[in-house]
């Protein structure tokens, strides 16, 4: 973003009827962990040119063409978080079933094969506990909602608050009620968290609108769930020189997050917001790849591949509760909702090199690029029914507002993967790998609570984290006994981030009576970490 503050008063984006998820929530679903077989993980995943491992089915399916024998494998292990404290149902150590798959080989010529593969692997493990705390110096989450009410105009990031027919405060587009024949229109900038504050804390006991200043905050959030990939591939080789592969992939999304956000007020009271959110759904993508041995007498290989966007069809739902405490406990205020949306991830491109020395050394290197600024949030805007096939097809259009915000906050990411395998004896392999994954978030990016989008309307939290680059270090060992193999891998992943409880708003001026008042709501960022280790075991059989 061009500035670290959001200036609501100059209108970030024009209002538009939209229905899509918020940028930071979408970013959680994009990208992949390093996971698969223990051999693949032990070599840092740098096998897109070396091939002959089932885990390449999802990156460069041409690698499936290097199998000479049919093979099945199964992988599971432990995922361990180094930092933080356990919270709710979040645990720092979790069992994980990570992979099962196989390859069936068929010979089509003296040096040519046509191979078929299937593999399930957990491409993203959400198990992670986030703990954050910091000072606020008079700013607060409820002040953000209060300022939006001051701004009024939806195009300026605000809303006009008045009572509905049930006596509840609602943020509307119009400053005055429309004609009785015209239903009032709720502003897209009116979020679920705004609804909670404007119907509890901001009116107070007297009904006079005001906000509470806070001295500090704490947040605890337990992320759980996964994205599971189901990949089906066909791959073949031409005279053991050119290998081609194509994968059709399906994805299963199961994410759950539960958080408790607390603020301590200057008046010795405080607020607690409990939020539970789920994201479920499915998606599919297509991957194509090629591996070439440019010199017939050399094992040196060059690989290239491209992965289409993952076309997701998702449902997000939440239940959020607010407890306002000012000397005594007040009744909880609750709100919840659910809606469907679509999201398309960016294209991914990869280039890889592989080489073997004799029968005991293998070297691999892979470079990948994926531009997360091109995440496409989609609006479900209707559909049509195909009576011939007895199917309903839902249509969608881009959420222009949210996609523009995504381009401000997210960016292109380069990934470098390096790996080596050494066999001191023919049936024992030692492996080592390294990954560098660039940061997908802009350093000064932040949520935009004034965005006219249903991604804002259904938002139930205000915090966000700008995560930095990832460094992964891997080790592995493999042992072969006749047709059986057992492999073990260890992975350490380190990532730092900058957490903020809400977005910064600076220098909003309004008139109260004859007095001009200028408000700002600034939150200091807090450093957080996502450091975790993985132990992974693979059992395989060749036939």
Give each language-model segment a name.
Residues 1-25, 539, 543:
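Bacterial Sec-dependent N-terminal signal peptides
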Residues 21-35, 40, 105-543:
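Outer-membrane beta-barrel porins/channels
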Residues 38, 50-59, 64-137, 225-228:
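Outer-membrane beta-barrel translocator/receptor signature
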